[in-house]
């Protein structure tokens, strides 16, 4: 699920934290990728007539096709991917997982009804909601990655937390995930849309956590408290507390301890749920179960791909076309066998700003944030006008 509305808050209040660009801009970088999130996106995106792709034996192949070709695209663009798989979920996440299961059961019922009486759009909508990453999907993707020569790690718990550890240690440039809670785990840089298909033409989003904190004028603890208020995988949001209110509450009161205390005293008009262990949720963001960066499992390297092994697995066992798999495997072999040119930024160290420069920079960020808010407001106003305009009028 990630953090509800966090990207919108960052876009409006800390726009300088977000950079967008083409995938080729990530050339020469090592990136730790949230594998489960990627596999889920492959299962949803790689489809035909609203259904996941299958081979002649009825086995699902969407995840393998996505993993092979999207990884190949990254390697073609000079990126060295490392996939990180989820381990056992924290106990506090069990409520969210139960809700996801319930939603999928409801979606299955909706899908059956849509197939009988609904439109193609209804079938597609409910079909996507039934998607679940299974243990078999994970195991098959790990087998594929091994044959491709691409390293992977199985995290003790949350993959995003493990990605953040590797990014902080400098073992990778960034963590890549669609889940915004990666920032809560203190990954210096989050890349989004990295594993999207080229056809979607979505730019890569590069979000810098230091600039997020600077733009929001918060320390990390306040930022995590904001994310918990917005609603995360560990806790539901407090009823009637939306993104604007959550931001206002943190800015005015500074911490969840103060906010919750005032709510319980009736000084704030919101009601805290009876079981709302925000301290435990915060602790999971600050002290997740992860392998330290110097752990043996974190010593990874990219190997030469097993071309014949890939052909046997994808073509013979999974029914892929050899005319597509073999050239792809050979491209992978060539790309991974080429020593990559180092990025220029690796030769230079950043120079610290003076107090005056910091002050001027902060003011510049405030002006940019204000301009972004005005632009967003104008866009919303224009959309509302267009929606209200009668059809057939210019």
UniProtKB/Swiss-Prot annotation:
Could you describe the post-translational modifications of this protein?
A: Phosphorylated. Phosphorylation upon DNA damage induces relocalization to the nuclear plasma.
What residues does Mg(2+) 1 bind to? Answer: 34, 86, 158, 160
Q: Where is this region: Disordered?
A: 358-394
In terms of InterPro entries, this protein maps to: 5-3_exonuclease_C_sf, Flap_endonuc, HhH2, PIN-like_dom_sf, XPG-I_dom, XPG/Rad2, XPG_CS, XPG_DNA_repair_N
Residues annotated as binding Mg(2+) 2: 179, 181, 233
Where do the record's region annotations for I-domain lie?
Answer: 122-253
Bias kind Basic residues: ranges: 374-394
Q: Name one GO biological process term.
A: base-excision repair
Q: Which UniProt keywords apply?
A: DNA damage, DNA repair, DNA replication, Endonuclease, Exonuclease, Hydrolase, Magnesium, Metal-binding, Mitochondrion, Nuclease, Nucleus, Phosphoprotein
- Report the SUPFAM superfamilies cross-referenced here: 5' to 3' exonuclease, C-terminal subdomain, PIN domain-like
Positions that bind DNA: 47, 70, 158, 231, 233
Q: Where is this region: Interaction with PCNA?
A: 340-348
As for subcellular location, the record says: Nucleus, Nucleolus; Nucleus, Nucleoplasm; Mitochondrion
Q: Which SMART domains match?
A: HhH2, XPGI, XPGN
Its cofactor is:
Mg(2+)
GO function terms (MF aspect): 5'-3' exonuclease activity; 5'-flap endonuclease activity; DNA binding; magnesium ion binding
Region N-domain: which residues? 1-104
**According to the lineage, what is the superkingdom?**
Eukaryota
Supply the EC number(s).
3.1.-.-
Instruction: Tell me any Pfam family this protein matches.
Output: XPG_N
Cofactor binding summary note:
Binds 2 magnesium ions per subunit. They probably participate in the reaction catalyzed by the enzyme. May bind an additional third magnesium ion after substrate binding.
Give a short account of what the protein does: Structure-specific nuclease with 5'-flap endonuclease and 5'-3' exonuclease activities involved in DNA replication and repair. During DNA replication, cleaves the 5'-overhanging flap structure that is generated by displacement synthesis when DNA polymerase encounters the 5'-end of a downstream Okazaki fragment. It enters the flap from the 5'-end and then tracks to cleave the flap base, leaving a nick for ligation. Also involved in the long patch base excision repair (LP-BER) pathway, by cleaving within the apurinic/apyrimidinic (AP) site-terminated flap.
Q: Which PANTHER family match?
A: FLAP ENDONUCLEASE 1, FLAP ENDONUCLEASE FAMILY MEMBER
Protein family according to the UniProt entry: Belongs to the XPG/RAD2 endonuclease family. FEN1 subfamily.
- What is said about its interaction partners and assembly? Interacts with PCNA. Three molecules of FEN1 bind to one PCNA trimer with each molecule binding to one PCNA monomer. PCNA stimulates the nuclease activity without altering cleavage specificity.
Q: What is this protein called?
A: Flap endonuclease 1
In its UniProt entry, the species of origin is given as Pyricularia oryzae (strain 70-15 / ATCC MYA-4617 / FGSC 8958)
